[in-house]
C-alpha cells in the first residue's frame, strides 16, 4: 500500500509549471471569493493553519480538530490515539507543515505528530521533545525540522532525534513566532518581544533591525527577491539592502496588526491582518501599494495550493478561497441599476447597443455609456432584438409592440397592421440581400428592400408557430428555427415548392453552418435545441447526430453558441458550456465513447446562470476580439476564451476506504486474500479545488466488469459489488478534471476472494467419496445378511412433481457434481446478466438458459436455496432495488422507476416483496441507509 500512495507523490510536481495563479494585473476585488463554514461541513470556524499533502488533500488545523478536504467533503481526522493523551485532554492542532518528502507534521497542544504512509505517530516530552505545546514549525534546506514552543525555546528534529537549543546557545528569547531560512542558508528566528536572532555553527546571534523597538513580531517571510518582510503589531516592515521601510494603514494595509505573510506563484505578496487581507503591489520604482478585501475577517493563515488558489484561514469566519474569475462583469452605471438588460447588439467597431425590459436603449462606446435613448411609445415594453439595415437605420424588436425603425432621431413603428406576423418579436436577422427577417411568436416576417412586408406562418408551411431565430446559409437558403423544427426556404423564397424540413417536432433554437466541413460529407449544420441537445446535420445524406447528456453534454437545453479556437461555446440551462468541435466530430464517427464538456457558471465568476431572452440571438454576441457577451438576469457576463487557461494538472485519484461485508478494512495494513467474503464497497475521491463538482470518474473491477463504468459528475463516489464469486480481482478507478485532463494511472487495489473450506471442490469431492463409501458399505452388509434373497436393484423412476404444491423431489436424477455446475451457471445469470430484471422471466425460460429441465431447476432452487421460484426471483429483485435506492434521488418517482427497472409489473407485488425481505417500506429503507452513511 505505501507504494500505491507514493505514485501520486511523484506524479504531480512535474506539472506545476502548467498552471497560472492569481493575475497580479487584476484588481483584488475581481477575484472570486468562496467561503466554507461549519454549515458546509468544516469542523470549526477558526482555521489556524493550512497545508496540502502530495496526494492533493488540503489539511486544516481548526478550533475543533484536524480536518481533511478534497474539494467536496470535509473529514475530521483523529491524529492522536486515546492512549497517548490523558482523559481530560483534547488534542488541538495548532500548526501544520508538509516537508520536502511530503510528510505532514502537526504541532499541537500535546506534542508533535508525524503523518507518513497513512499512519500517525506522536512525539512528546517522553521522546525528547522539550515541551508539548508547539507554536511554530519549519524545515531547512538540509531537511531538519525546527520546532518552537508556546513558552519555551526551540528544538531541531533530525534522524529521529530531538536537539534542544536555548539561552545556553545564545538564544536569549522564547516565544519564537517565525523561523525563516534566507537565500544564503542562514536561519533567522523571530521572537515575539526580543527581536530576531540568526543561527550558524550551532550558535545564535542577535540580528539587529532598526525600527523594531516596542514592536511585537508576529510573522516573518522572505520573498523571491530576497526582501525580508516582518509583520508586527504596529505594521509591516520590509528589509533589504536599500534599507528598512515601514508600512501601515496609511499605505493601504487593511490593519496595522499583521498576523501572516506569504507570496504566491505570481509574486503577489499577501498579508493577513486583524482586519482583512491585503495584497502588496511592488512597483518598479521601489514603492508599494496595497489593495484590501474581507476587512470584516481576522486572517490567521494563508496557503497557495498546487492549482494556484489562495486559501485563507480566519478567526471565526471559516475557510475562504481566492481564485481567478473566468468572467468579467459589465453593468449599467449605478443610476441605471434598476434597468434589466434584455438584448445586446455589436454595431460599429467599439460600439455596443443594449436594450432593457423597461424600453430604454443604451449606446456604449469602448465600454463607456455615451447615449441613452427612450423611444416614444416604448416605456415599460421590453426590447428583445436590435439590428441595423443596409441604409444604417437601427431596428428594435419588442415584446408586444412590433418593431421600430430609428431614422435619425425619429422612430417608425411596424405592427400586425403593417403586415407583421405578430407583435411579439424574438429576433431580427439581415440576409445578404439586405432583407430584414423578423422572428415572432406567430411565424416570420420579411421586409424587403422596397419596404414591402410578407409573412410566412404555419398555415403557409412553417414547421411550428413560435420562431426563435433565422439563419442564411452559403447557398442563400433561409433556415427558420421554430418550436416545432426547422423550415428551409430555398433562395429565401416563401412561395417555393421545394421547402425542406428537419427535426420535425423538436424545438430548434440556433443554427450554424460549419465553415470547414469534411469534403465528402458536404455541408454540415450545427443546431441547438431546447431540450434535445445539440444536433449535427450532414446534408449529403441527411444524417442527424445528437449530443445529449447521455453522450457527455452537461445539459440538453442549448441556446445560442459560438465557434472560437476549435471549441464550441454554448449557452445552456447548465451555464456556459465548452466542448471541442473535434471531439464532437469524433463521437459522430464513433471515434470516442464520450465527449468532455466543461461548464462555466457562478463558481467561475458569471453573474448568474439564468438568462433573459435566451432563445434569441440577441441574448449573446461575439466581438471582433472573440470576446463572448452573455445577457443574464443580473447583467452581462463577459468571457474571453483566449484568456481561459486549461488546468493541465490531472487530479490525483485515491481509494479512501473499503468495506467488506459491512466492516471497514484498514488500507494501511492491506491484505490481499479474503476467505468467504462476498460484498465489497469502495469509496474513492480525487482531491481538486478549481471545479471539484465537475470531476468525472471511470471505474472497473477487473475479473468482474468487462468494460469501464462511467460515473458522471456530482454522483456519490462510492461503488458496491455484491455476491462476488471466488476469484482474483483488481478494482481500478481513474478521473479527469473539468478541462478533460485524465489521470489514467488512477488508483487500484488487487485482491483475491477464496471460498470457505466447505465451498471448495476438494471438500465437495471428499463428501461424495465418503457418501459413496457409505453407500457401498451399506449395500455390501445388506447382501451379507443371513436369509436375504438376491434381488435385482430396480432403477428409480423419475417422477414429475407439481412445484406449486411443493411436492418432494423423489428419485431425482441430478447428481451432486452436475448440480454444482448448474448452480454456477445460475449464479452467473443472476449476478452478472441480472436476468431477474426481465419482467417476463419464467421457470421455463430460465431453465432453458441453463440447459436443464424446469423440473430440475425447480429442484435446485428448492433443495439448494430453500426457496420456490417466485421467492428466488423476487429476492434478487429486491436486492437490486436496495442498491438503486442507496444512490437514487428522493421521491416516489425514483422508487417506482426502480421497481419497474428490476422487473416488477405490479407496484403492489413490489411493495409486498420489499416489506417481506426488508421488514420496512422502500422509503423507510432509504432513510435508514442515509442515517448509516
How would you label these PLM feature ranges?
Residues 1-754, 760-779, 783-784:
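Carboxylate-rich, polar loop motifs that coordinate divalent cations or form catalytic acidic clusters
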Residues 888-926:
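Sequence-specific DNA-binding recognition helix
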Residues 725, 853, 905-906:
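Short coil turns linking two alpha-helices in DNA-binding domains
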Residues 781-888, 913:
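Membrane-proximal linker segments that couple transmembrane helices to downstream signaling/catalytic modules
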Residues 424, 572, 845, 877, ...:
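Ca2+-coordinating acidic residues in Ca2+-binding motifs
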Residues 868-873, 920-928:
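Short, Lys/Arg-enriched C-terminal cap helix and immediately downstream tail that follows
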Amino acid at each position: 500500500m505505501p507504494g500505491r500512495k507514493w505514485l501520486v507523490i511523484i506524479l504531480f510536481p512535474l506539472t506545476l509549471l502548467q498552471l497560472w495563479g492569481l493575475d497580479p494585473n487584476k484588481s483584488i476585488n475581481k477575484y472570486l471569493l468562496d467561503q466554507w463554514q461549519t454549515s458546509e461541513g468544516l469542523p470549526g470556524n477558526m482555521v489556524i493553519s493550512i497545508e496540502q499533502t502530495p496526494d492533493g488533500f488540503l489539511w486544516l488545523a481548526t478550533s475543533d480538530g484536524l480536518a481533511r478536504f478534497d474539494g467536496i467533503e470535509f473529514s475530521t481526522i483523529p491524529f492522536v490515539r486515546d492512549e497517548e493523551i490523558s482523559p481530560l485532554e483534547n488534542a488541538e492542532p495548532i500548526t501544520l507543515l508538509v516537508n520536502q518528502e511530503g510528510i505532514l507534521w502537526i504541532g499541537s497542544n500535546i506534542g508533535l505528530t508525524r503523518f507518513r504512509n497513512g499512519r500517525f505517530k506522536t512525539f512528546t516530552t517522553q521522546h525528547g521533545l522539550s515541551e508539548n505545546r508547539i507554536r511554530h514549525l519549519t524545515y531547512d534546506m538540509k531537511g531538519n525540522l525546527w520546532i518552537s514552543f508556546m513558552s519555551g525555546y526551540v528544538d531541531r528534529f533530525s534522524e529521529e532525534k530531538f536537539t534542544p537549543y536555548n539561552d545556553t546557545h545564545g538564544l536569549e528569547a522564547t516565544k519564537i513566532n517565525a523561523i525563516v531560512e534566507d537565500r544564503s542558508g542562514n536561519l533567522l528566528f523571530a521572537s515575539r518581544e526580543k527581536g530576531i536572532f540568526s543561527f550558524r555553527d550551532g550558535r545564535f546571534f542577535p540580528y539587529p533591525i532598526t525600527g523594531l523597538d516596542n514592536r511585537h513580531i508576529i510573522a516573518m517571510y522572505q520573498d523571491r527577491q530576497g526582501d525580508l518582510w516582518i509583520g508586527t503589531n504596529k505594521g509591516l516592515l520590509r528589509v533589504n539592502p536599500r534599507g528598512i521601510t515601514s508600512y501601515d494603514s496609511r499605505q493601504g494595509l487593511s490593519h496595522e496588526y499583521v498576523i501572516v505573510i506569504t507570496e504566491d506563484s505570481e509574486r503577489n505578496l499577501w498579508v493577513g491582518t486583524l482586519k482583512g487581507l491585503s495584497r502588496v503591489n511592488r512597483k518598479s520604482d521601489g514603492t508599494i501599494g496595497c489593495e484590501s478585501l474581507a476587512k470584516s475577517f481576522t486572517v490567521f493563515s494563508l496557503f497557495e495550493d498546487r492549482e494556484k488558489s489562495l486559501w485563507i484561514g480566519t478567526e471565526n469566519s471559516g475557510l475562504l478561497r481566492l481564485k481567478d474569475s473566468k468572467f468579467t462583469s459589465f453593468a449599467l452605471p449605478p443610476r441605471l441599476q434598476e434597468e434589466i438588460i434584455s438584448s445586446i447588439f455589436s454595431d460599429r467597431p467599439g460600439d455596443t447597443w443594449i436594450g432593457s425590459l423597461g424600453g430604454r436603449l443604451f449606446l456604449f462606446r469602448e465600454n463607456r455609456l455615451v447615449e441613452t435613448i427612450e423611444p416614444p411609445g416604448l416605456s415599460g415594453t421590453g426590447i428583445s432584438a436590435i439590428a441595423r439595415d443596409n441604409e444604417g437605420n437601427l431596428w428594435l424588436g419588442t415584446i408586444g409592440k412590433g418593431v421600430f425603425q430609428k431614422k435619425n432621431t425619429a422612430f417608425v413603428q411596424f405592427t400586425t397592421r403593417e403586415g407583421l406576423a405578430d407583435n411579439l418579436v424574438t429576433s431580427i436577422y439581415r440576409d445578404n440581400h439586405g432583407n430584414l427577417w423578423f422572428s415572432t411568436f406567430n411565424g416570420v416576417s420579411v421586409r424587403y428592400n422596397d419596404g414591402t412586408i410578407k409573412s410566412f406562418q404555419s398555415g403557409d408551411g412553417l414547421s411550428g408557430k413560435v420562431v426563435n431565430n433565422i439563419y442564411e446559409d452559403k447557398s442563400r437558403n433561409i433556415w427558420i428555427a421554430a418550436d416545432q423544427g426547422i423550415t428551409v426556404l430555398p433562395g429565401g423564397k416563401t412561395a417555393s415548392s421545394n421547402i425542406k424540413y428537419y427535426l420535425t417536432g423538436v424545438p430548434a433554437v440556433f443554427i450554424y453552418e460549419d465553415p470547414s466541413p469534411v469534403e465528402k460529407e458536404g455541408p454540415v449544420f450545427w443546431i441547438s435545441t431546447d431540450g434535445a441537445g445539440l444536433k449535427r446535420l450532414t446534408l449529403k445524406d441527411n444524417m442527424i447526430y445528437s449530443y445529449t447528456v447521455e453522450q457527455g453534454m452537461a445539459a440538453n437545453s442549448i441556446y445560442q453558441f459560438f465557434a472560437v479556437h476549435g471549441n464550441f461555446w454554448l449557452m445552456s440551462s447548465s451555464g456556459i458550456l465548452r466542448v471541442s468541435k473535434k471531439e464532437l466530430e469524433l463521437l459522430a464517427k464513433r471515434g470516442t465513447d464520450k465527449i468532455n464538456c466543461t461548464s462555466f457558471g457562478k463558481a467561475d465568476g458569471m453573474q448568474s446562470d439564468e438568462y433573459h431572452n435566451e432563445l434569441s440571438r440577441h441574448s449573446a454576441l461575439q466581438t471582433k476580439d472573440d470576446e463572448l457577451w452573455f445577457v443574464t438576469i443580473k447583467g452581462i457576463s463577459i468571457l474571453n476564451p483566449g484568456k481561459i487557461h486549461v488546468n493541465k494538472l490531472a487530479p490525483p485519484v485515491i481509494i479512501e476506504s473499503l468495506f467488506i461485508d459491512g466492516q471497514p478494512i484498514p488500507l494501511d495494513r492491506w491484505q490481499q486474500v479474503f476467505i468467504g467474503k462476498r460484498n465489497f464497497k469502495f469509496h474513492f475521491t480525487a482531491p481538486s479545488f478549481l471545479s471539484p463538482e465537475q470531476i468525472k470518474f471511470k471505474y472497473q473491477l477487473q475479473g468482474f466488469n468487462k468494460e469501464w463504468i462511467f460515473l458522471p459528475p456530482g454522483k456519490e463516489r462510492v461503488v458496491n459489488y455484491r455476491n462476488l464469486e471466488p476469484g482474483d480481482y483488481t478494482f481500478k478507478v481513474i478521473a479527469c478534471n473539468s478541462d478533460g485532463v485524465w489521470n489514467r494511472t488512477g488508483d487500484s487495489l488487487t485482491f483475491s476472494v477464496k471460498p470457505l473450506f466447505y465451498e471448495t471442490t476438494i471438500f465437495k469431492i471428499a463428501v461424495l467419496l465418503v457418501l459413496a463409501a457409505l453407500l457401498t458399505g451399506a449395500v455390501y452388509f445388506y447382501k451379507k445378511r443371513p436369509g436375504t434373497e438376491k434381488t435385482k436393484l430396480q432403477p428409480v423412476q423419475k417422477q414429475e412433481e407439481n412445484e406449486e404444491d411443493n411436492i418432494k423431489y423423489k428419485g431425482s436424477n441430478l447428481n451432486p457434481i452436475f448440480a454444482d455446475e448448474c448452480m454456477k451457471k445460475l449464479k452467473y445469470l443472476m449476478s452478472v446478466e441480472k436476468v431477474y430484471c426481465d419482467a417476463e422471466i419464467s421457470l421455463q425460460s430460465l431453465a432453458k438458459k441453463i440447459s436443464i429441465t424446469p423440473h430440475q431447476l425447480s429442484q435446485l432452487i428448492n433443495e439448494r436455496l430453500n426457496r420456490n421460484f417466485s421467492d428466488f426471483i423476487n429476492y434478487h429483485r429486491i436486492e437490486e432495488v436496495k442498491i438503486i435506492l442507496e444512490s437514487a434521488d428522493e421521491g416516489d418517482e425514483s422508487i417506482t422507476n426502480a421497481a419497474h427497472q428490476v422487473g416488477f409489473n405490479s407496484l403492489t407485488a413490489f411493495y409486498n416483496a420489499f416489506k417481506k425481505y426488508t421488514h420496512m417500506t422502500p422509503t423507510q429503507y432509504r432513510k435508514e441507509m442515509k442515517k448509516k452513511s
